[in-house]
């Protein structure tokens, strides 16, 4: 696990503010499953992001990339539940009089 310093990263960045923006965006991408350009070496995503910046694999152009759409899992789950409930109600209404009779039951 190689130590990464701010000075190592600043050789590829204009200033510390930009380093923070690029590093945080790249760390977020790594945490969400993006492929790393360097070995993980059992490091956290922030350290890997800084190592990528220091090695020149990631630069300021990452700030121009469009963010991935955020999935609203709660809204999606709620919509699916409503759809299933509506489907269940529709199924329950079909063939109400067609229930199978049990032996010994007069109809």
UniProtKB/Swiss-Prot annotation:
Q: Where is this region: Disordered?
A: 81-107
**Gene3D superfamilies noted in UniProt:** 3.90.940.10
- Which reaction(s) are listed as its catalytic activity? RNA(n) + a ribonucleoside 5'-triphosphate = RNA(n+1) + diphosphate
Its Gene Ontology cellular component terms are: DNA-directed RNA polymerase complex
What GO molecular functions are on record for this protein? DNA binding; DNA-directed RNA polymerase activity
The protein's job, in short, is: Promotes RNA polymerase assembly. Latches the N- and C-terminal regions of the beta' subunit thereby facilitating its interaction with the beta and alpha subunits.
Q: Which NCBIfam families does the record cross-reference, listed alphabetically? A: rpoZ
Its name, as the record gives it, is DNA-directed RNA polymerase subunit omega
Q: Whose protein is this, by species?
A: Alkalilimnicola ehrlichii (strain ATCC BAA-1101 / DSM 17681 / MLHE-1)
**Underlying gene:** rpoZ
């Amino acid at each position: 696990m190689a130590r990464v310093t701010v000075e190592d990263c600043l050789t590829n960045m204009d200033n510390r503010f930009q380093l923070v923006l690029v590093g945080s965006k790249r760390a977020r991408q790594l945490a969400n499953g993006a492929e790393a350009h360097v070995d993980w070496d059992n490091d956290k995503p922030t350290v890997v992001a800084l190592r990528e910046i220091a090695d020149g694999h990631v630069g300021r152009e990452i700030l121009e990339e469009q963010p991935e759409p955020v999935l609203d899992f709660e809204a999606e789950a709620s919509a699916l539940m409503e759809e299933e409930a509506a489907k269940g109600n529709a199924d329950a209404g079909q063939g109400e009089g067609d229930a199978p009779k049990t032996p010994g039951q007069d109809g």
